[in-house]
Amino acid sequence: SWDWQVFCKDTIDGEIVPRCFGGAGDVTYLDWLLSAWGWTLSVSLLALGVALVLGSIMGILRTAPHRGWVLLGNAWTELFRNVPLLVQIFLWYHVVPALIPPLRGVPSFILVVLGLGLFTSARISEQVRAGIQSLTGGQRMAGLAMGFTLPQTYRYVLLPMAFRIVIPPLTSESMNIVKNSAVAFAVSISELTLFALQAQEETARGIEIYLAV
């Protein structure tokens, strides 16, 4: 039988806590679950912000008329898209701080946000590029003919139409980034995956734990 009171138990002594929320230093599994949700959403939202900014910039560069910018955007996209996410997280956590000493004091939370954000930026770059290239060439020429500079043409003509086209895949990507945030458990960030793994080991109530997650 299911035992939903598992979330009202103290994580130390296993005693049931009234009203399921710990106090005076006590932490219940419900407290832990809510904290894990907070970590997951924090990682996901911050990484999504990083990915949207960098991905949009790289997507624009890949459609620019200058070959150097195109090469930079393509190199960025291919690098971060083709290296597995878990490998990138380990590189940011173990290798990059060793190569750049000032980063040794950076919290693992920030490093995971950067790793997940850069990985997702490559995917968003591809979507933004496809959205811009789906527009007819006359849109760019019309903007330039009206006296806009190239940056103004992108800002006022191309990007508003392109982003309307790529809203569906961007919505899908925002859901993917929440799922991908599970890799944070590999560097001991107490998000939902780490909570589920540890809580089921301590309580032997895997079904209830994973249904709540």
Where are the predicted features?
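Transmembrane alpha-helices and adjacent helix-loop boundaries
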Residues: S1-V213
